[in-house]
Curated annotation (Swiss-Prot):
Pathway: Protein modification; lipoprotein biosynthesis (signal peptide cleavage). It is found in: Cell inner membrane. This is Lipoprotein signal peptidase. It catalyses: Release of signal peptides from bacterial membrane prolipoproteins. Hydrolyzes -Xaa-Yaa-Zaa-|-(S,diacylglyceryl)Cys-, in which Xaa is hydrophobic (preferably Leu), and Yaa (Ala or Ser) and Zaa (Gly or Ala) have small, neutral side chains. The gene is lspA. InterPro entries: Peptidase_A8 (IPR001872). This protein specifically catalyzes the removal of signal peptides from prolipoproteins. Belongs to the peptidase A8 family. The chain crosses the membrane at residues 10-30, 68-88, 98-118, 138-158.
Length: 167
């Protein structure tokens, strides 16, 4: 009799699909409801809806590079998502410490890829600020990418300490 393989964490791609769905739904709302480049207060003194566009990457990195960055960041996001999906296929289903961060990054990356391919830029709309200090605008996909990256770093750090203590 052959032994059944352990189920992989690919089921966690459903979380990626939820992130993509929420991201695209929120951006459709923004495009149909918010004026461009006009702050709409949510929490006065801290949070605005602010419809803007980003042709670059995080913090508008390379946003004025002339157009090639659209394809570069699209290819980078698809490549990283493919690598993380491969790692998910090698991860045990119950290993949520690895699976959830991977799935969040995949969902966020693909959400922004959809924007780049549909609009030629990423739609950003969440703006946080204190006084005159404004954080760069972002979206749900960006939040998922950052949350996933933090999870990968933190869980990797803690798991590394745990395995060193066990060894």
């Amino acid at each position: 009799m052959s032994q059944r393989p352990n189920p992989s964490a690919l089921i966690w791609l459903l979380l990626s699909a939820v992130v993509i769905g929420l991201d695209q739904w929120s951006k459709a709302w923004v495009l149909s409801s918010l004026p461009e480049y006009t702050p709409v207060p949510v929490i006065d003194g801290f949070w605005n809806w602010y419809r803007t566009y980003n042709t670059g990457a995080a913090f508008s990195f390379l946003s004025d590079a002339g157009g090639w960055q659209l394809w570069f960041f699209t290819a980078l996001a698809v490549g990283i998502s493919g690598l993380l999906a491969f790692w998910l296929s090698r991860t045990a289903r119950g290993d949520w410490r690895s699976a959830v961060p991977y799935a969040l990054v995949i969902g966020g990356a693909i959400g922004n890829v959809i924007d780049r391919l549909m609009h030629g830029h990423v739609v950003d709309f969440i703006q946080w600020y204190v006084g005159e200090h404004t954080w760069p605008s972002f979206n749900i996909a960006d939040s998922a990418i950052v949350g996933g990256a933090i999870g990968i770093a933190l869980f990797g750090l803690f798991d590394g300490k745990r395995s060193r203590k066990a060894g």
